[in-house]
């Protein structure tokens, strides 16, 4: 991953403003668009210690995740009082297993993730700088089974007004990254500089967007 020390340091210092304490309401609202059923497998890239993993595990028999930070993965299981089975996969990866959950530690690009029916990306693509996003998406495509679907949550703002992460990934870039896939914009939540949080960040506009991305069967 690009600049892994940045993320290791964030977790070590507990500087995790990107972490939501509750299940993402956008996941709850739009997951049905992926046509889920219990037998369909799910992958959550760069999953951190997301509460979304718990929610997804109640609806699917297999939920895989990958997270660079071992601190995050251990915290996830400890905070839920889960005792996972831990398997050393290689010098780079460990696998934490508990019921429906299979969480790998280490690099997203080399973790031995199995292909899945559905992918949920809430804070992964937007965490990556522009120079690595195409490589990230290519790996995502490799892990998606034919006919599979991706629920993607992104941000769109003027990148010159804030350094990121999270980075701005506008629709034009989504169209380029997922060329050949069916792309549907499900939701667009737009705020301008009259919104106090947006003004505080020095942004003129800010949009959170939800996409359904579908591969051919």
UniProtKB/Swiss-Prot annotation:
Q: Which UniProt keywords apply?
A: Cytoplasm, Methyltransferase, S-adenosyl-L-methionine, Transferase
Q: Name one GO molecular function term.
A: thiopurine S-methyltransferase activity
List cystine links.
Answer: none
| Entry's EC annotation | 2.1.1.67
List locations, semicolon-separated. Answer: Cytoplasm
Q: Which domain of life is it from?
A: Bacteria
The entry's S-adenosyl-L-methionine-binding residues are: 11, 46, 67, 122
Annotated Gene Ontology cellular components are:
cytoplasm
Task: Give the matching NCBIfam families.
Answer: PRK13255.1, TMPT_Se_Te
Q: What is this protein called?
A: Thiopurine S-methyltransferase
Source organism of this protein record: Vibrio atlanticus (strain LGP32) (Vibrio splendidus (strain Mel32))
Q: What is the lineage of its organism?
A: Bacteria, Pseudomonadati, Pseudomonadota, Gammaproteobacteria, Vibrionales
